[in-house]
Amino acid sequence: MSKTHFGFETVEENEKAKKVAGVFHSVASNYDLMNDLMSAGLHRAWKAFTIAQANVRPGGKVLDIAAGTGDLTKAFAKAAGPTGEVWHTDINESMLRVGRDRLLDKGVVTPSLLCDAEKLPFPDNYFDVVTVAFGLRNMTHKDSALAEMRRVAKPGGRVMVLEFSKVWEPLKKAYDVYSFKVLPWLGDKFAKDADSYRYLAESIRMHPDQETLKTMMEQAGLDAVKYYNLSGGVVALHVGTKY
């Protein structure tokens, strides 16, 4: 059995999937709070930038992977309109349920599907835009997930990855203090779950940096891959096109 990382811990691949599932079952009901704590509220601006870059048109087909509470899904559904097709998907049943209920509460009726990004149940060449926000770093086989995202994108379609990344060097010390000291404390204080928040901080550090992820997307067959550093590299939006 192959080994992989769960935060800073080395575990069996099948064990990682179970541990990640446990984290997100635990944080699902407080996921928006978690995002606020992890990003100091900036996740809204990062998502708004991603939505603008996606430029979804009326009638567009969009796949939102690891869609969680549905922030991107909601915006894409509005942009695609009644003639569009926007899928809200997640591998975690708790996250999917919370997101589906919140979308319905906001009057957004769009399909929600429990699925694994490494084995997407969609045909080739189907979507105009495929997005994953703050989900890729939790996947065991990132290369497989990226290849699947490319597969289901139409020729000319785009794959977009919004993810925590490598912060600029002058900010690193302060960012480490926040990630490994402040964040678990906040997780314990507000969500009674310091361990899950500690894992999330560790998973960010183990995630590929901007240039490495760019290379991985190119190796998955995507072209014209570029990235935008946001908030000093705390987050990066990578965009690749399928030609």
Curated annotation (Swiss-Prot):
Keywords: Menaquinone biosynthesis, Methyltransferase, S-adenosyl-L-methionine, Transferase, Ubiquinone biosynthesis. It catalyses: a 2-demethylmenaquinol + S-adenosyl-L-methionine = a menaquinol + S-adenosyl-L-homocysteine + H(+); a 2-methoxy-6-(all-trans-polyprenyl)benzene-1,4-diol + S-adenosyl-L-methionine = a 5-methoxy-2-methyl-3-(all-trans-polyprenyl)benzene-1,4-diol + S-adenosyl-L-homocysteine + H(+). Pathway: Quinol/quinone metabolism; menaquinone biosynthesis; menaquinol from 1,4-dihydroxy-2-naphthoate: step 2/2; Cofactor biosynthesis; ubiquinone biosynthesis. Coiled coil: none annotated. One of its GO terms (molecular function) is demethylmenaquinone methyltransferase activity. Its EC number is 2.1.1.163, 2.1.1.201. GO terms for biological process: aerobic respiration; menaquinone biosynthetic process; methylation. Disulfide bonds: none annotated. It comes from the Bacteria. S-adenosyl-L-methionine binds at T69, D90, D116, A117. InterPro entries: SAM-dependent_MTases_sf (IPR029063), UbiE/COQ5_MeTrFase (IPR004033), UbiE/COQ5_MeTrFase_CS (IPR023576). Belongs to the class I-like SAM-binding methyltransferase superfamily. MenG/UbiE family. NCBIfam families: MenG_MenH_UbiE, PRK00216.1-1, PRK00216.1-5. Methyltransferase required for the conversion of demethylmenaquinol (DMKH2) to menaquinol (MKH2) and the conversion of 2-polyprenyl-6-methoxy-1,4-benzoquinol (DDMQH2) to 2-polyprenyl-3-methyl-6-methoxy-1,4-benzoquinol (DMQH2). This is Ubiquinone/menaquinone biosynthesis C-methyltransferase UbiE.
